[in-house]
Amino acid sequence: FEDGKKVRFFKSNKETIK
C-alpha cells in the first residue's frame, strides 16, 4: 500500500504548482 507515498507526492506537486 503506497498511500503515504502518493499523498506525499501529491503534496509536493501541489506546492510546486503553488
UniProtKB/Swiss-Prot annotation:
Coiled coil: none annotated. It comes from the Bacteria. One of its GO terms (cellular component) is ribosome. The keyword Repeat does not apply. GO terms for molecular function: rRNA binding. The keyword RNA-binding applies. Keywords: Ribonucleoprotein, Ribosomal protein, RNA-binding, rRNA-binding. One of two assembly initiator proteins, it binds directly to the 5'-end of the 23S rRNA, where it nucleates assembly of the 50S subunit. Part of the 50S ribosomal subunit. Belongs to the universal ribosomal protein uL24 family. This is Large ribosomal subunit protein uL24. The lineage of its organism: Bacteria, Pseudomonadati, Pseudomonadota, Gammaproteobacteria, Enterobacterales.
